[in-house]
Amino acid sequence: SPRSLKADFLLSLCELVVGGRDGLQPIEKTVIDRCVRQVYREMALGLETGKTPLLQDLYEELLRQPEPEAKRIATALELYCTGSLNLFNHPTNVNLNSRVVCFVLKGMGENLRKIAMHITNDFVTSAVGNNFKNGVATWCYFDEFHILLRDPLTASYFVTVWKMLRKQGCVPSALTQNVKDLLASREIENILDNTDFMILLSQAQSDRAILAKQIGISEHQLSYITQSNSGAVSYTHLRAHETC
């Protein structure tokens, strides 16, 4: 159900914010789930007003719970609700039903970037699912892909995109100008295994050697990405399989 999916999303969000090395404990997960159900139950009673729950609503519901674990979770979320990183604790002013939606994470600090990526990933998953039900394909473009793969949680998500979401009509494309960092990711092999279309522009010598070893490019093929005009950029483009 939509409520279960949202509960799962918020559990993983709290895991990112609160969990630490050991992750959320069973009691903490139970408390979060209870609060999510309560928040969405209250929202259901006011559907005509168009009210959408915010992270603030979960924060306040946690403060009303008797368990000390709830207090711990609420304290961790405070930074993102009433603290200096409360950017996402507001109703969106973006038309998310537009045919083209662009998320720009440039300039965000590391802590806020992780939260932003998690929220963006949830939106992509929901959009792909909704479009698939309506028989519509979803084209997703991920720029500066080597940066997105630095976070293990986000990297794992992109493996899911390349393996699973494409079966729901998602056509993901990744772009990067840093081949070394891209191929250093632990998850890149899984992504490359599910990619059958690549565009390679001119590459530095060290990058050409890495590409030749990693994806089996011949010397003759490498000759096409050896020379470039003055001012030209090095660019790599990956696209997942478009068919199951």
Regions found by a protein language model. Name each.
Residues 1-170, 183-186, 224, 233-238, ...:
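P-loop NTPase motor domains
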Residues 214-215:
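Conserved small helical "lid"/interfacial subdomain of P-loop NTPases
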Residues 104, 175-176, 201-202:
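Conserved beta-strand segments of the P-loop GTPase G domain that flank and frequently precede/overlap
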Residues 170, 175-178:
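Conserved H-loop
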Residues 207-211:
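Conserved AAA+ ATPase core "coupling" helix
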Residues 179-182, 206:
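Short acidic loop-to-helix transition motifs that present clustered carboxylates
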Residues 189-200:
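A short helix-turn-beta junction within AAA+ P-loop NTPase domains corresponding to the substrate/partner-engaging
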